[in-house]
Structure formats: C-alpha cells, structure tokens
C-alpha cells in the first residue's frame, strides 16, 4: 500500500513538472530567496566613504542579470559571425567581456536617467530596452533596426540613451550637457557619460570635467578601462593610469568592472552622490574586452592569447555570477542551462530577422534630416527655410 501511494505521488508530481507554471513554482521552493554577497572594496579618491562591501542579491535579480548578460554575450558573438558573413559592413566594435559593466550600470540607476557612450554601444542599447532584433537589424542596415538601418553599429539610440558616438571622447561633453539640462529642469535625473581608457586623455574630457565641477552638474563620468586603447596598453598612453583621479577636484572611485554587484553598488553610490547636489563624480570600471578593438583587429598583436584566456578562466563576469548564484543556492546548473538555451533561441531568431528584413528604400534617404518645426513668424526671414520640405 505504501509503495503504491509513493508511485501515485511520484506520477502526480511528474505531471505537474511538465507544466511550466508549476515547474517554476516547484523550482522556486527549493532555492533561497536572496543571499548576502561580499564585494571588493573600491579605491576612493576625495571620498571619506564609498559603496558597501556587501550587498543582498535576490534570486529574481540574479536570474535577470544572468539572462541579460548571456543575451549580450551571445548577441555580440552572433554579430561577429554576421560580420564575417558580410551581412554587417563598416565599423563594428564588440563588448563581450564587459557585460557586467552594461548590466550593472543599468541596475544602479532609474529608467528615467540618461546614458551616453562611445561606439562600443550594443550592450547598453539592450539594457536600455532595445530588443535583440532591433539591434542586429540595425547592424545589418535593415528597416527594422532601431535607427531604421541608417545608424549602424556606432549610432544606435533608445529612450534616454543618446547612442554610440564615432568621435573618440566627443560624447563626454555632450553628457555634461545632458546633465546641465537635468539640473536646469530640476527633475532629479542624472546622466552617465561613458568613455574608454583611450579617450581618457582627450582634452574635451577635461573641459567637461571642469564645467561639470564648476556648475555642480549631476554627471557620472565613467571610464571603462579595458586596458587597451585600440592596440595601445594603458601604461604606454597615460602618465598616470589612476583614471578615477583624473577629475582633479572631482571625487572618484575605482571599481571591479568584472563583478556585476560591484558595478551595481558603485553606480547606486555615484547616482546618490549626484542626486544629492554634490556635483559630478568619476568612476573607473576595470574591465576587459575579449575581441579586438574592432572587427578589423584580431586583438593578438599587442597582447597574447594566454592573457585573454587567463582573464576568461579567472575573471569572466558571467562565470563569476553563475558561481555566486549556485554557491548561494539562488539557482542550479540545470536552470541556468535552460536560460542559456532560451537565450540562444532568441538570438538565432533575431539573426534570422536581421538577415531577411528589407533594407530601407532609396526614397527614405532624405527623411529625418530636419525637425518639422512650426513656420517662422516672419515669412522668408530664414534663407534655409525652403529646404525644410526635403524631409
């Protein structure tokens, strides 16, 4: 009788597990709801106190972060494949290896806050809300792209995301301008202005520092230090590699950019600093890119394969999060494999769309050049007025 009862219960639970909703319920029962995780202390500059050295990670957050990081990783690898198949032309800068920066920054701010970055922008496009389909379609120059196929890799845009910028460092003063607008409007919003270690020596970056400090703008200057500006190591291009100290009178912090929780907590700290009216702050994210500078760079002429593999094996951001989730009973190997399979399917479907969606027609070439403002009050007062009908 007891054996028969056990068999019946086993069959009942087996049937329940076949149903996704019940399977998710049963899975959640065996996992912890949250875990307290230690994170590396940040190096501080002109700050008496920094971000916390421990934080709570919920199961829901962990699963979300893991999935988003996997999407970015697979999306970039698919972009590499499409480029080699000549579906993508021109410039293409990939961010695989830097997923913790992309996802961690978004986790530390509000959706209404603003982000502006350089040309390595695909990951931030995704975390700002764009779909994989629209990003890959933009890379292949299709109508369904986020910029209607006209921007390509370096010029993608989303709500409160002012895209990739092709000129090295040019986005930094623009970010200060966005922060000035936030202060002027008194809306409590901030701007994250991202740039790489290669752009950190640009004069316009220091000009933006100065004006932001002078006017106490709510701007977080973020240097993504991936150790190489194109093919030049940071030690060969900068007299000082303490990028978090380059703001002179602006406080700064150096963050482990391979750990999503370190990035998240540092971003929250920096955002609170700006929102409280203390002015700008500089964040240096120590990270690494697995690909070369761009698709035309194999990435092994100025660094060894062993160096890249060493970072992959010891500091990979997805691996670190996966290990943290499993060791804290926030997930299981089997559950994460299911997420991986789901992500792979999503990216494959997006790639199919990006290679079959039609290209924008020639008659769209002159569209979206001018904003259709109301007519000028004085007829004929502006010599360029007749060209506004081109769009």
Curated annotation (Swiss-Prot):
What are the UniProt keywords, alphabetically? Carbohydrate metabolism, Glucose metabolism, Magnesium, Metal-binding, Mitochondrion, Oxidoreductase, Phosphoprotein, Pyruvate, Thiamine pyrophosphate, Transit peptide, Tricarboxylic acid cycle
Q: What is the activity-regulation note?
A: Pyruvate dehydrogenase activity is inhibited by phosphorylation of PDHA2; it is reactivated by dephosphorylation.
Quote the subcellular location field of this record: Mitochondrion matrix
An example Gene Ontology biological process: pyruvate metabolic process
Describe the protein's quaternary organization and the partners it interacts with. Answer: Heterotetramer of two PDHA2 and two PDHB subunits. The heterotetramer interacts with DLAT, and is part of the multimeric pyruvate dehydrogenase complex that contains multiple copies of pyruvate dehydrogenase (E1), dihydrolipoamide acetyltransferase (DLAT, E2) and lipoamide dehydrogenase (DLD, E3). These subunits are bound to an inner core composed of about 48 DLAT and 12 PDHX molecules.
Tissue occurrence: Testis.
Q: Short name of one Pfam family for this protein? A: E1_dh
The chain's transit peptide is found over 1-30
Needed cofactors: thiamine diphosphate; Mg(2+)
Instruction: Write the Enzyme Commission number(s) for this entry.
Output: 1.2.4.1
What is the organism field in this record? Answer: Rattus norvegicus (Rat)
**Encoding gene per record:** Pdha2
Q: Name one GO cellular component term.
A: mitochondrial matrix
Q: Which residues bind thiamine diphosphate?
A: 119-120, 166, 168, 197-199, 226, 293
Q: List positions binding pyruvate.
A: 93, 119-120, 158, 166, 168, 197-199, 226, 228
What's the stated role of this polypeptide? The pyruvate dehydrogenase complex catalyzes the overall conversion of pyruvate to acetyl-CoA and CO(2), and thereby links the glycolytic pathway to the tricarboxylic cycle.
Detail which positions bind Mg(2+): 197, 226, 228
Could you tell me what this protein is called? Pyruvate dehydrogenase E1 component subunit alpha, testis-specific form, mitochondrial
Catalytic reaction list? N(6)-[(R)-lipoyl]-L-lysyl-[protein] + pyruvate + H(+) = N(6)-[(R)-S(8)-acetyldihydrolipoyl]-L-lysyl-[protein] + CO2
